[in-house]
Curated annotation (Swiss-Prot):
Its cofactor is Mn(2+). It holds the Pfam family Adenine_deam_C. It catalyses: adenine + H2O + H(+) = hypoxanthine + NH4(+). This is Adenine deaminase 2. GO terms for biological process: adenine catabolic process. PANTHER family: ADENINE DEAMINASE, N-ACETYLGLUCOSAMINE-6-PHOSPHATE DEACETYLASE. Its EC number is 3.5.4.2. HAMAP family: Adenine_deamin (MF_01518). The keyword Phosphoprotein does not apply. Belongs to the metallo-dependent hydrolases superfamily. Adenine deaminase family. The gene is ade2.
Length: 567
């Protein structure tokens, strides 16, 4: 007699290798699938029987590229929400906390308890470029990488994103990190951040060892990257009919996966990887393949041999669906246990230094003005133009009026962007000009500014900017909106300036108010928060800002804000 935990009857079970649902009975022993059969024998003694009455069963969902910090929640609070939507395993690249708090903060983050299986990537690019271009709270160097490689929770190298370091600097830190990983863990996947890169530059990435990409794709990029041996992780912004048609037409299912990358709290309260599945299906991906690309292919890519399929010996993580048409989730099981019976009893607090991480000088409205020679009447400026979709920007030149030595950027319909070093290292402040952002009186301030997470303020008048700056600094981090002189929306992020200790639903409610307030100020983008928060991301094309200046992303060279003036 075989003692078994659970018997599943009257279920339609997904078979990974045929991509079909068939009526089967399932036996679970010690939290693993033991047998899947038309009818189980009488040799079992079951503790419990689950009658699904025709419901559908698929493996637990695996998210092979994501950032927990994007939810602005602790790993524990994130897991309690994500598991409800069928996500049972994630591979988290926690480079945000590494940027703010270094390896000590990263390890404390990794030690947080979780209802889901959380594996981690080595943050490969902390800082995202190099310390000469941006100031961060921590740096992940070779010694830190060696330490992390010894941790069994580390299963891949996180997205390598330093374009110049990978393609044209043989002795760069990122090249040394890649070489170390290849030596110490030769089978470990090396993840990439390869936006809009093709031909010879793409070959350089792949030759260096980078074999995956999760950035925004086009049909041509998908085809070129996969044909050159890359594994493609499709996130929300890459899901459209044209891209999905490329996957389907070329039968690229085994070389791609669906991922979340960044899911903010106001989206997470409505869904996680299941939402990506629904969108992919809406764009033309057959559901059976969407399931395949969120269970089997991510497991294979990450070299998991113990999960991703419903088969003997695999971990019994599974999702019960009411129906296939709406991908409606009835229940989720972790190692054969329904999630309503799971709990976390040993939460670990973050260190006090994570709660006191903002060290900035006092600023007033006069700090948010552009001063030039009083002899000038006009001046030409390099302006960052925001796109209405996605996070790419471009540089445009605009001629601005000057009055009494002050540049009148407001009259030109521009906003001022300020990035203040927040770690108490230099106190440096960079100013930039932005078009197609907000157009009403107010400001937005945040310490959730990828990837260096310095204090960033965008505003249309200096008084509003000073109010926003002071508030986000005094509360040790956050994301807030000031309309005129009133704070109208505010998410407090007291843990390292990027994480809240509140539940997801509360964070989500507050973040939704921030998003609406940004729209009210005139910010137009498919994802306002990511659009603003990546104005500081020096690896996202094409013009971005740090505490150390305005930079051309591809060449990593500094660009002056103001050019020639006219008297």
């Amino acid at each position: 007699m075989i003692k078994a935990d659970l018997k599943i009857i009257n279920g339609q079970i997904y078979n990974t290798f045929t991509r079909q649902f068939t009526a089967k009975e399932v036996a679970i022993v010690d939290g693993k699938f033991f047998q899947i059969a038309d009818k189980l024998s009488d040799d079992f003694k079951f503790e419990d029987i689950l009658d699904l009455k025709g419901s559908y069963v698929i493996p637990g969902l695996i998210d092979s590229h994501m950032h927990i910090e994007s939810s602005m929640a602790t790993p524990t609070n994130f897991s309690e929400t994500a598991i409800r939507f069928g996500t049972t395993t994630v591979i988290a690249d926690a480079h945000e906390i590494a940027n703010t708090s270094g390896i000590k903060g990263l390890k404390r983050f990794m030690d947080q308890p979780s209802l889901i299986d959380t594996f981690f990537a080595i943050p490969s690019s902390v800082p995202s470029t190099n310390p000469e271009l941006e100031t961060t709270g921590g740096i992940i160097d070779l010694e830190e990488v060696k330490e992390l490689l010894a941790d069994p929770r580390i299963i891949c190298l996180g997205e390598a994103m330093n374009f110049k370091g990978i393609t044209s600097e043989p002795n760069s830190l990122i090249r040394k990190i890649i070489a170390l990983c290849q030596k110490k863990r030769p089978r470990m996947p090396l993840e990439g951040h390869v936006p809009n890169i093709s031909k010879e530059d793409l070959a350089k990435f792949i030759f260096a060892g980078i074999l995956s990409d999760h950035t925004q794709q086009t049909p041509a990029l998908i085809k070129e990257k996969i044909e050159n041996g890359m594994f493609i992780q499709l996130q929300k912004k890459s899901l459209n009919k044209e891209n999905i048609e490329t996957i389907v037409k070329n039968h690229f299912y085994d070389y791609s996966a669906l991922v979340t990358d960044d899911t903010m709290a106001d989206d997470l309260i409505n869904g996680h990887l299941n939402s990506i599945i629904k969108l992919a299906v809406k764009c033309g991906l057959p559901l059976e393949w969407a399931i395949y690309m969120t269970t089997y292919t991510p497991a294979q890519h990450m070299h998991f041999q113990d999960r991703g399929v419903i088969a003997p010996g695999k971990i019994a993580d599974f999702v019960v669906l009411n129906n296939l048409d709406g991908f409606s989730i009835k229940n989720v099981y972790k190692r054969g246990v329904p999630i309503d019976k799971l709990s976390i009893d040993d939460e670990k607090p973050f260190a006090s230094e994570e709660y006191h991480s903002i060290y900035v000088p006092n600023r007033s409205a006069k700090d948010f003005t552009l001063r030039v020679s009083k002899d000038l009447k006009k001046i030409t400026a390099n302006v960052i133009e925001i796109a209405a979709k996605g996070t790419f920007t471009k540089a445009v030149k605009k001629e601005l009026l000057v009055k009494d030595g002050i540049v009148d950027w407001q009259k030109a319909g521009l906003a001022l962007l300020a990035v203040q070093e927040r770690y108490g290292k230099t106190g440096q402040l960079t100013l930039a000009l932005v078009s197609k952002s907000i157009n009403k009186s107010g400001a937005i301030a945040t310490t959730w500014a990828h990837d260096h997470h310095n204090l960033m303020v965008l505003g249309t008048n200096p008084d509003s900017m000073a109010i926003a700056y002071d508030k986000v600094a005094s509360q040790q981090g956050g994301y807030l909106v000031v309309k005129d002189k009133e704070i109208v929306a505010n998410v407090q992020l007291p843990i390292a300036g990027i994480i809240s200790d509140e539940p997801i639903d509360i964070i989500g409610h507050k973040l939704k108010k921030v998003r609406l307030a940004m729209k009210d100020l005139g910010y137009v983008n498919t994802n306002e928060i990511m659009s603003l928060s990546t104005l500081s991301l020096l690896v996202s094309p094409s013009i971005k800002v740090s505490d150390k200046g305005i930079f051309d992303v591809k060449t990593q060279t500094k660009i002056p804000l103001l050019l020639a003036g006219e008297e």
